[in-house]
């Protein structure tokens, strides 16, 4: 998929997620790896209303170090750009990352401490996890949950440490407590599928609390 088409697809998802109440106002951020240059990615610019996003409301960032490479006048990278940069750098095969602020993901409380940084939380072995390509019967799965530091690069650093020390999660997402999930996939379509499954999973978990 060429870059223009990719940005158009991400823009459509932004409008859809706004309608689903997954990204109110300027909350959330979506990105796609540049298919013609996989060492860079395009992410929604900071301060853009997700229900009114245009396919020109993106900036280009380096996968290697998060350096801003291209941006139209006045556009700045999303606040969570450092998290996307870590995900693309740690997983060279992924092509899309989606971060939203759903109600259920904010209702879930695990009490991850600031000094603790992160914790693996068990997830129920329900049918929807097949959307992640996991077909084992009643698998014993966990999801990484991270403390919601005000300084977002600190969250990104803890995610990187987790990936290096623990490994890539078996499930294609992570959760920032009191904030929202971030999912990834090899393509925009796969990442969207994963996000829909994660939304359902977190709904179930929120109702069990």
UniProtKB/Swiss-Prot annotation:
Pathway: Amino-acid biosynthesis; L-methionine biosynthesis via salvage pathway; L-methionine from S-methyl-5-thio-alpha-D-ribose 1-phosphate: step 2/6
Signal peptide: none
Family matches, as Pfam families: Aldolase_II
SUPFAM superfamilies in the record: AraD/HMP-PK domain-like
Catalytic activity of the protein: 5-(methylsulfanyl)-D-ribulose 1-phosphate = 5-methylsulfanyl-2,3-dioxopentyl phosphate + H2O
Residues binding Zn(2+), per UniProt: 99, 101
EC number: 4.2.1.109
One GO cellular component term noted in the UniProt record for this chain: cytoplasm
Cofactor note: Binds 1 zinc ion per subunit.
Co-factor requirement: Zn(2+)
Keyword set includes rRNA-binding: no
Keywords on record: Amino-acid biosynthesis, Lyase, Metal-binding, Methionine biosynthesis, Zinc
GO molecular-function terms, A-Z: methylthioribulose 1-phosphate dehydratase activity; zinc ion binding
Gene Ontology biological-process annotations: L-methionine salvage from methylthioadenosine
Biological role stated in the UniProt entry: Catalyzes the dehydration of methylthioribulose-1-phosphate (MTRu-1-P) into 2,3-diketo-5-methylthiopentyl-1-phosphate (DK-MTP-1-P).
Similarity section: Belongs to the aldolase class II family. MtnB subfamily.
Name of the protein this chain belongs to: Methylthioribulose-1-phosphate dehydratase
């Amino acid at each position: 998929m060429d870059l223009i088409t990719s940005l158009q697809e991400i823009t459509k998802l932004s409008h859809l997620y706004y309608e689903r109440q997954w990204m109110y106002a300027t909350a959330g951020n979506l990105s796609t790896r540049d298919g013609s240059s996989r060492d860079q990615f395009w992410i929604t610019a900071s301060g853009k209303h997700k229900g009114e996003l245009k396919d020109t409301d993106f900036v280009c960032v380096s996968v290697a170090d998060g350096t801003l490479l291209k941006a139209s006048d006045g556009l700045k990278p999303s606040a969570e750009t450092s998290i996307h940069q870590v995900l693309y750098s740690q997983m060279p095969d992924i092509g899309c990352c989606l971060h939203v602020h759903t109600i259920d993901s904010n209702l879930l409380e695990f009490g991850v401490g600031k000094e603790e940084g992160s914790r693996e939380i068990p997830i129920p072995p329900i049918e929807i996890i097949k959307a992640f390509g996991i077909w084992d019967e009643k698998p014993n799965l966990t999801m990484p949950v991270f403390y919601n530091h005000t300084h977002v690069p600190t969250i990104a650093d803890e995610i990187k440490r987790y990936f290096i020390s623990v490994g890539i999660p078996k499930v294609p997402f992570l959760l920032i407590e009191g904030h929202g999930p971030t999912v990834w996939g090899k393509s925009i379509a796969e990442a969207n599928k994963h996000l829909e499954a994660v939304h359902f999973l977190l709904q179930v978990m929120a109702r069990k609390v």
